[in-house]
Regions:
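Amphipathic, Lys/Arg-enriched alpha-helical "gate/interface" segment within cytosolic domains
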Residues: 2-132
């Protein structure tokens, strides 16, 4: 069944934050995700999260209102001090969408077809090895 809110899991181990997205996200789903990230960030000193890894294996899509909300969210990412975002298990549609979202950003954005490809570049990421 189509559920437009989406589900997510967040784990942070400074300087990394890990997000796992599942399902389809509309405006409300992106708002819940944003609030979850802000809450997670509040558990650490400001600007300690520098790298974000996003698992899109079970991610389906964004609605148009969800995309607008996501673009607004990422506009504030620079203020949070993120230096790099890595997307794992990305398909061509999601890649196109996230490339548009990050188009005018100074944040380094990388796309990996699977976990193994990510680990070739980041072999010491124990969270990914153990949990994804």
């Amino acid at each position: 069944m189509f559920g437009a809110h989406g589900e997510f899991q967040i784990c942070s181990q400074p300087p990394q934050m890990y997000l796992k997205l599942k399902g389809s996200f509309n405006n409300e789903g992106i708002t819940l995700l944003t609030n979850g990230v802000v809450q997670e960030l509040s558990t650490h000193p400001e600007n300690t999260i520098k790298f974000v890894v996003v698992n899109l294996k079970e991610f389906e899509l964004l609605t148009l209102d969800g995309l607008d909300s996501l673009e607004a969210y990422f506009a504030g990412v620079k203020e949070r001090g993120y230096q790099r975002v890595d997307y794992i298990n990305i398909n061509i549609i999601a890649k196109n969408m996230f490339e548009k979202v990050w188009k005018n950003s100074d944040v380094e954005v990388n796309f990996y077809k699977d976990t193994e490809s990510y680990l070739l570049v980041h072999p010491s990421d124990s969270y990914i090895k153990q949990n994804w």
